[in-house]
């Protein structure tokens, strides 16, 4: 039996939960080994690894008992990426990165590209530069003893962001390139399995809220899947596509069979998601060899769950891994570079040495002159303020004065006329001035006391009380608006329960309240 599993892992370096929840958070490499063992598959295809080649470490890339193959995003770090881990008893005979062949090395590649004349070289490079496809080709033996070729296409198809129409075009062009390559492999005599995150819920049964989605059947991605797949799985139908959705072949009417849930809304708790992950096999392969196709929703650690299939064939491992295998990368191959490669003789002409010496002498003289000027203009210690008293706590909460303070070196002219007018002369004037001065001090002390009281009340008051939602009378959660617009950055309260249909009383109610600025 050959068992294949696909999983959008949502970051291979993140501290995974679920399968690897017993590992410390800084041992992601050990967690990957545990995940592969727990999935118990001969071939494991991972999507959205979110790792670039320079960030790939040896413990992540080389796992005992497996040979691995990675495709990286060449434009962005921490984005996209796919990886395939094969047990040593399922070592492929060939491996290749990308669908177009532009990244092929002509040594150990899969080949069979089909007619790609409708694409420009720039378009092909853009489609393959995000690290979304990885091909491994294996030798398999059927129960009749016949040896055949099986090609696995591990894909992470693009997401069509509604706010970026160009990404829908990119997604559909990627679909087209994937179909051309898969059909070319079929025409060359190889069996083909397309598995991974296709980022499209094919039919209404594959989406929890399909009835409320406008023009669900008219979506370009769903129309593409209609042309690729045979209707009604293994049964006869009006349209016979080259591939079969293996899960719907075995479970044609299973509802609630989802593989992806929104982590923001907590929709996984109530199983309100969509089926975006598939194992698609060519018709002959699925009908003759597929024994089961399954989902693993109990496996946590990502916003997706693993999917897989079991084939009644045995793998014929290659004697040597293809060159794309990560153990052959220079950084992991264990070959030591000679130190002479880092030492380059530096030759200079006499004229260059003489000009450099003159430049250095001039620089030294100029530096000495600058140091002398700095010493002559440096202020004496007595001129610098030496006040180091402890600051009042309120000074950190008061706005700094906008007008600059006067320099201590500037002497203001004395005003004898004003001082003569303001100085009390008679005993009555002195008494009045004394009373006024006392009242001013009392008022100032009172204002300062009130200011301190209001300040400490605001500090010690604590956060505002969390409101209760109207539907369940439960404490709400605070969210922040991240959509560009006039309310960007504003905070609001909403029901803390997971998202679901309005008819479900255990799902989120429609409570909404803007948060008051503190």
Curated annotation (Swiss-Prot):
Site of covalent link Glycyl lysine isopeptide (Lys-Gly) (interchain with G-Cter in ubiquitin): 371
SUPFAM superfamilies the record matches: DNase I-like
Activity across pH: Optimum pH is 6.0-8.0.
Localisation: Nucleus; Cytoplasm; Mitochondrion
Residue positions binding Mg(2+) 2: 197, 199, 304
Co-factor note (free text): Probably binds two magnesium or manganese ions per subunit.
Expressed in which tissues: Highly expressed in brain and kidney. Weakly expressed in the fetal brain.
GO MF term set: DNA binding; DNA-(apurinic or apyrimidinic site) endonuclease activity; double-stranded DNA 3'-5' DNA exonuclease activity; endonuclease activity; phosphoric diester hydrolase activity; zinc ion binding
UniProt-recorded name of the protein: DNA-(apurinic or apyrimidinic site) endonuclease 2
Lineage: Eukaryota, Metazoa, Chordata, Craniata, Vertebrata
Gene name in the database record: APEX2
